[in-house]
């Protein structure tokens, strides 16, 4: 008989694992649990999560509880009689009563090489640190965050131009491939879960808008990584003439720069560039507040510069916060 699976996930990159499970005859997805519909867009119309939309298309029953702390939601989940749960960025930490429902527990897809980068923003963390490789981990969930035993891992190179959005999608697609083979082997007892080396653990945080504020006293290398690590959220942002300016793409063009204060806008043979605490950062694509992204050279042509104008105010703060993944 097929393995009975309940799938918990919400964002677009969690759709690939769901589709792979539904298409595999070894598995029966008996239900999907996802976040409730939320208002979105300018009209604030109620919008289902990408996982809910996929589940309805695939003909899988869907549960959308406000929280799995609700006893009624826990009872609905238990009524599905799953053998195992699969979690892919569901959006809520599972409590012990939920963890106890499937006999085989819950298998999680985590987009890092655990124990590195536990927590909610592992892809951004790897990019920001300039790692040469990253990967995906298939693991069992326990009561602590991303600390459970490992079933399988897949390592992939981390390209120097990687951005969090596309890389997250790629890792979950790879994770879907690893998952469908690992899950069957785990259910048959052919895999022995391996405990993590907790002494090697590193952690990531829930990102807020403030994390994306550029401090131009930082090295150019780190600021360039910010433009990729914080795409799509929260973005790498600075202030220019009293309004936010998002730096979408940039390139380090010098290890050192002229003797000008960090944040100073400079014209170079490579186009507009900004002095940093260590190096010169050429701007490639920017997005002024309320406008579409445009080449930085076009943005610069529209400016009348007075000498020594500077970008940024590292003490500025923006409101709000949300998770990357």
Curated annotation (Swiss-Prot):
Instruction: Spell out the reaction equation it catalyses.
Output: L-methionyl-tRNA(fMet) + (6R)-10-formyltetrahydrofolate = N-formyl-L-methionyl-tRNA(fMet) + (6S)-5,6,7,8-tetrahydrofolate + H(+)
UniProt keyword Protein biosynthesis present: yes
Name under which the protein is recorded: Methionyl-tRNA formyltransferase
Question: Which EC number(s) does UniProt give?
Answer: 2.1.2.9
- Single GO molecular function: methionyl-tRNA formyltransferase activity
Source organism lineage?
Bacteria, Bacillati, Chloroflexota, Chloroflexia, Chloroflexales
PANTHER family attached to this UniProt entry? METHIONYL-TRNA FORMYLTRANSFERASE (PTHR11138), METHIONYL-TRNA FORMYLTRANSFERASE, MITOCHONDRIAL (PTHR11138:SF5)
**Cross-referenced NCBIfam families:** fmt
Which parts of the sequence bind (6S)-5,6,7,8-tetrahydrofolate?
112-115
Q: Keyword check for NAD, yes or no.
A: no
Gene name in the database record? fmt
Give an example GO cellular component term for this record.
cytosol
Keyword annotations for this protein, in alphabetical order, are: Protein biosynthesis, Transferase
| Transmembrane intervals | none
Q: What does this protein do?
A: Attaches a formyl group to the free amino group of methionyl-tRNA(fMet). The formyl group appears to play a dual role in the initiator identity of N-formylmethionyl-tRNA by promoting its recognition by IF2 and preventing the misappropriation of this tRNA by the elongation apparatus.
| Pfam families with a match to the protein in the record | Formyl_trans_C, Formyl_trans_N
Question: Which protein family is named in the record?
Answer: Belongs to the Fmt family.
């Amino acid at each position: 008989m097929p393995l009975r699976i309940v799938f918990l996930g919400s964002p677009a990159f969690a759709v690939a694992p769901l589709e792979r499970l539904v298409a595999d005859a070894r598995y029966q997805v008996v239900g999907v649990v996802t976040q409730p519909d939320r208002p979105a867009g300018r009209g604030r119309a109620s919008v289902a999560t990408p996982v809910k939309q996929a589940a309805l298309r695939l003909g899988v029953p869907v549960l959308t509880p406000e929280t799995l702390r609700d006893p009624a939601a826990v009872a609905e989940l238990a009524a599905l009689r799953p053998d195992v749960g699969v979690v892919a960025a569901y959006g809520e930490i599972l409590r012990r009563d939920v963890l106890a429902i499937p006999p085989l527990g819950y298998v999680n897809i985590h987009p890092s090489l655990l124990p590195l980068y536990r927590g909610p923003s592992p892809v951004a963390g790897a990019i920001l640190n300039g790692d040469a490789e990253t990967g995906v981990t298939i693991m069992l969930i326990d009561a602590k965050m991303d600390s459970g035993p490992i079933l399988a891992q897949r390592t992939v190179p981390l390209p120097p131009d990687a951005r969090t959005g596309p890389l997250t999608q790629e890792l979950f697609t790879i994770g879907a491939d690893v998952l469908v083979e690992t899950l069957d082997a785990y259910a048959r007892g052919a895999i022995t879960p391996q405990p993590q080396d907790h002494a090697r653990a590193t952690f990531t945080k829930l990102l807020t808008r403030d994390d994306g504020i550029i401090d131009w006293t930082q090295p150019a290398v780190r600021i360039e990584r910010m433009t990729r690590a914080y795409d799509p959220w929260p973005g790498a942002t600075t202030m220019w003439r009293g309004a936010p300016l998002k730096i979408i793409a940039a390139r380090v063009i010098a290890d050192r720069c002229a003797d000008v204060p960090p944040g100073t806008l400079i014209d170079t043979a490579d186009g507009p560039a900004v002095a940093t605490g260590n190096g010169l950062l050429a701007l490639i694509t920017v997005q002024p507040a309320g406008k579409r992204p445009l080449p930085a050279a076009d943005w610069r042509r529209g400016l009348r510069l007075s000498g020594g104008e500077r970008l940024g105010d590292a003490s500025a703060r923006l409101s709000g916060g949300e998770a990357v993944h």
